[in-house]
Amino acid sequence: MSCPMSLSNPSQILLRNSELLVAKVPLFINLPEDGFIEAYTEIHKPDTIHCFNTNFIDYQAITKKHCSPTKTKNVKATFASTYQTTSCHDLVIIAFPKSKAELNFTLAMITHCINDETKIILVGEKKGGIQSAAKLTQHIFSCCQKVDAARHCLLFVGLFQPERLSDVFNLQDWFKKYQITVEGIELTIASLPGVFSQQKLDVGTALLLSNLPSKMTGKVLDFGCGAGVISCFIGKKFSGTNLSLLDVSALALTSAQESLALNGLSGNVFPSNSLSDVNEHYQHVVSNPPFHQGVKTHYQASEDFLAGINKKLNKQGNITIVANSFLRYQPIMETHIGNTRVITKDKGFTIYRAQLS
């Protein structure tokens, strides 16, 4: 069948193999809103499509397109770090994640809602590592067969081993916990598979923590919080702060919440598409801005954040970020916030600070 041009390459290879996708109650895991859901519905007319996304932007797009009061009720969208349902799915389509550990996490997470006849489809771009799908799933699948290769993508079909379906999924088993010490402050960080800098403190964040403002009080926003390292450090060092942490990833948000708890801290942890759901004003904003989406480098979200954050700062509020030195963030900050200083440079990273006048 012909595919609408708006479809991503993985969605196109799925529709090329439409005969494999017949189902009454399918589950789509981390598929984007690119027209595939609509095309699938027209072809197969399922009873209900369940869409589970750990990315808030994809979840918002699916909800807007398919779950508004004026739309049909056969699409159910969920944004969370883990999937819970009373349904039993006869088909699961998984967008192959950039983290191999995240694939194992995802497969373990769905054992409660499938059976040994549930068809599992793995789809993704070759450069994302999907070539290793059969090897990665050999301990959990009874078979995993490559059925198509097209548009720089691969499509695998697998079935679970029945004995694996009895395993009970426990989220706590999947946190990787590690200890770090910065400026004499000891922290315990918890990180789920797929979350940035799992199991260690990255160079950029370490540089940022050593170059924060000398005094911090009031409301602090940690933009792109990941596992919550920055907020945990600030909360421990500056007891007069009120922490808010945002990220686009449900896996990151759950990790950050766990990290706060492990360090005896609390904070407002919430999802946001850049600044879409930021409703407060802050005295301090800190960030190691993310610029990777999936396996692609993508700067727009960080640039939008820097261009819009002035509207979320208190008068005399400041923002401190760390970035790869090759990124041209200083002119954006100068234009939209004000005088922007280079605090330090080291190991390919630069610390910038700007204060709203």
Curated annotation (Swiss-Prot):
SUPFAM superfamilies, alphabetized = S-adenosyl-L-methionine-dependent methyltransferases
What's a GO cellular component annotated to this UniProt protein?
A: cytoplasm
What does the record give under GO molecular function?
A: 16S rRNA (guanine(1207)-N(2))-methyltransferase activity; nucleic acid binding
Against Pfam families, the record matches this protein to: MTS, MTS_N
Source taxon at top rank:
Bacteria
- Show the InterPro entries listed in the entry: DNA_methylase_N6_adenine_CS, Mtase_sm_N, rRNA_ssu_MeTfrase_C, RsmC/RlmG, SAM-dependent_MTases_sf, Small_mtfrase_dom
Listed under catalytic activity are: guanosine(1207) in 16S rRNA + S-adenosyl-L-methionine = N(2)-methylguanosine(1207) in 16S rRNA + S-adenosyl-L-homocysteine + H(+)
Q: Which compartment or compartments is the protein found in?
A: Cytoplasm
Indicate the transmembrane segments per the record.
none
First-tier enzyme category under EC: transferase
What's the EC number here? 2.1.1.172
Tell me its family: Belongs to the methyltransferase superfamily. RsmC family.
What is this protein's function per UniProt? Specifically methylates the guanine in position 1207 of 16S rRNA in the 30S particle.
Task: Give the multimer and partner information.
Answer: Monomer.
Protein name per the record: Ribosomal RNA small subunit methyltransferase C
The encoding gene? rsmC
